């Protein structure tokens, strides 16, 4: 078994004006267990950043901390700063529902509501008091077009979301998330339940979406990270080991552990 120097780090930074999001000294605890260990990380606007690493390394925990989803876990505690538009959204006085409007989440498995395709998109808007049908129709069409689903469902908007394929359901969930106009999309292994064709379609959708959104994606699929991201970050045991342009991570990693992980020789 290879002995690695875990003090070895290579982490890029960006000019302040290009930042969509950043964390400073971010720690996440589940009870007494420290799952994320003081991560400083920056995300560039309108780029796709992939978070990779072995199971249990903390990448999903880190992702869920960015829009305060860990607040839903009783034993979770998050310290440090999560900086969005210069504001620390980890402050206890922040409205987490407002935060999640700006940092939308797409989960591992498609989770459409038990409603029509149309109502999946309009549900949050109607609850917020939007009643004008023309406005709602426009939100639905715009969101589904951005998620590359409109042409497939425009004649079936009032059918159940459960009539869609797995890949279509995931793109519906993306459409639902972007309908509230977030700046950032957080995706936790969004292709793990999809077949290769649906995965390819999802990646093509991501390429289009990054024109308007910043995307942060957790993936176990090295090929997907290499294909679909601009930047890649390697996590291990709650630490950020290496963070660089994706081509550098896969072709010229600075840390031996990173190189071994992406080449399948880790351990």
From Swiss-Prot:
Single Gene Ontology BP annotation: phosphate ion transmembrane transport
Binding-site positions, ATP: 53-60
Residue stretches making up the ABC transporter domain: 21-262
Keyword flag Ion transport: no
GO molecular function: ATP binding; ATP hydrolysis activity; ATPase-coupled phosphate ion transmembrane transporter activity
Location in or out of the cell: Cell membrane
Protein function: Part of the ABC transporter complex PstSACB involved in phosphate import. Responsible for energy coupling to the transport system.
Keyword rRNA-binding: no
Family stated for the protein in its record: Belongs to the ABC transporter superfamily. Phosphate importer (TC 3.A.1.7) family.
Protein name per Swiss-Prot or TrEMBL: Phosphate import ATP-binding protein PstB 2
Alphabetical list of PANTHER family matching this protein: ABC TRANSPORTER I FAMILY MEMBER 17, PHOSPHATE IMPORT ATP-BINDING PROTEIN PSTB 2
UniProt GO cellular component terms: plasma membrane
Keywords: ATP-binding, Cell membrane, Membrane, Nucleotide-binding, Phosphate transport, Translocase, Transport
Complex and partners: The complex is composed of two ATP-binding proteins (PstB), two transmembrane proteins (PstC and PstA) and a solute-binding protein (PstS).
Enzyme class: translocase
Coiled-coil ranges from the UniProt annotation: none
Membrane topology classification: Peripheral membrane protein
Lineage top rank: taxon: Bacteria
InterPro entries (UniProt xref): AAA+_ATPase, ABC_transporter-like_ATP-bd, ABC_transporter-like_CS, P-loop_NTPase, PstB-like
EC number(s) given by UniProt: 7.3.2.1
Organism: Streptococcus pyogenes serotype M1
Known catalytic reactions: phosphate(out) + ATP + H2O = ADP + 2 phosphate(in) + H(+)
């Amino acid at each position: 078994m290879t002995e690695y120097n875990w003090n070895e780090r290579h982490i890029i930074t960006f000019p302040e004006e290009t930042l969509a999001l950043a964390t400073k000294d971010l720690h996440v605890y589940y009870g007494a267990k420290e799952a994320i260990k003081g991560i400083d990380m920056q995300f560039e606007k309108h780029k796709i950043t992939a978070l990779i690493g072995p199971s249990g390394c903390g990448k999903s925990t880190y992702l869920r901390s960015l829009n305060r989803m860990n607040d839903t876990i009783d034993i979770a505690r998050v310290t440090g700063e999560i900086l969005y538009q210069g504001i620390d959204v980890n402050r206890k006085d922040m409205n987490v529902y407002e935060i999640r409007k700006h940092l939308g989440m797409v989960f591992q498995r498609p989770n459409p509501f038990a409603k029509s395709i149309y109502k999946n998109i309009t549900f949050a808007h109607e609850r917020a008091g939007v009643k004008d049908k023309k406005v709602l129709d426009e939100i639905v069409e715009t969101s589904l077009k951005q998620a590359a689903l409109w042409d497939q469902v425009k004649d079936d908007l009032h059918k159940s979301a459960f009539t869609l394929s797995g890949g279509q359901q995931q793109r519906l969930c993306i459409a639902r998330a972007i309908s509230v106009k977030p700046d950032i999309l957080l995706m936790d292994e969004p292709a793990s339940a999809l077949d290769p064709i649906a995965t390819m379609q999802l990646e093509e959708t991501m390429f289009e979406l990054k024109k308007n959104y910043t995307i942060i994606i957790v993936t176990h699929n090295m090929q997907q990270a290499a294909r679909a991201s601009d930047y890649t970050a390697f996590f291990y045991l709650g630490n950020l080991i290496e963070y660089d342009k994706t081509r550098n991570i896969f072709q010229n990693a600075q840390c031996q552990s990173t190189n071994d992980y992406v080449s399948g020789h880790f351990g």
